[in-house]
Amino acid sequence: MFKICALSLLFFGLPMQYKMVKTKVNESITLMLPEEFYPMTPEDIARRYPSVRSPLGAYTIPSLMADFSVNISATRWRASDIDMAKNFFRAGVYNLFDKVTMIREEVQTVNGKQFIVFEFDSRINGDPSSLEARQPVRRYNYVQYLLINGKTIVFSFNCHARIKEQWQQAVAEIMTSIKVKNNI
């Protein structure tokens, strides 16, 4: 019994160590991702990120339980409006989900650039009248917004809530490795 508990803790309760590899999203954006992440196919992107704008980059893992994406938002902000933009994006987070438990909300400097950071757990309630979506969907999310040259670049990680502890440390490494050239 002890061995089963120990193995369960090892596989489900402790953060995993990932080999990080440099990833070039485009000519202006590089970051480190765990090596098991691979670019999503156009079909995966269309299914998981339905939008008029395709992401600059979208990556997933073989189990499809964790995703990382880089997008340019339609909202345009000046870097000097970072506090107002933070409140705007915060409201958007709370409107997007049925329940949000904010873990971290701040402006953080990463490689000389100021990012708006939201780390949170989310829940979308299930529909009791639906045969497909009865159970709530719980996810761990880490989102960073960069206001640069009149653009808003969004770096977003999410995974199933039950594997949150496995990914939190790696996500922090991903987000602090982001490098964006000024010419974007």
Where are these regions (language model features)?
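Surface-exposed amphipathic alpha-helical segments
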Residues: 35-39, 150-184
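Short, ordered beta-strand-loop transition motifs
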Residues: 24-25, 45-51, 107-114
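Short N-terminal segments immediately surrounding and downstream of signal-peptide cleavage
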Residues: 17-34
